[in-house]
């Protein structure tokens, strides 16, 4: 059974992420959605919140597992005995960074391969960063994220406004 890892911060999980999980789940026996701590970014949602949202959104997939991780992705891949990494490419601008990352990952773990998937056309423009900004400013993000995520974005905005 081919086991693949789809890593990301998923802050929050979007329809674009869901689309890639759906397509990866049809291609591979097991998809591990690996929600990263990502010390280089200041996440809007905590790791626990992001894992919970992803689990709730992806609950209908029998061959998908959602888990959080910290540290190097290649160490996580070794622990999971996974040799394939799935990465999404929305635009040409994503390619250069992802290409470099794939090369560095192969240098750390020569047995790993990176497979690039492009999202369906209707999801190519979705960015979790932009979704957060639209939600923060009170805009409608229902075209971009699952209803459960919309509710969490609303709750988070209230918490932030109350200084929690």
Swiss-Prot record:
Protein name per its UniProtKB record: Phosphopantetheine adenylyltransferase
Keyword ATP-binding: yes
High-level lineage: Bacteria, Pseudomonadati, Pseudomonadota, Betaproteobacteria, Nitrosomonadales
Entry's Gene Ontology cellular component terms: cytoplasm
Function: Reversibly transfers an adenylyl group from ATP to 4'-phosphopantetheine, yielding dephospho-CoA (dPCoA) and pyrophosphate.
Enzyme Commission numbers on file: 2.7.7.3
The keyword Nucleotide-binding belongs to this UniProt entry's keyword annotation: yes
HAMAP family: PPAT_bact
Domain of life according to the entry: Bacteria
Organism: Nitrosomonas eutropha (strain DSM 101675 / C91 / Nm57)
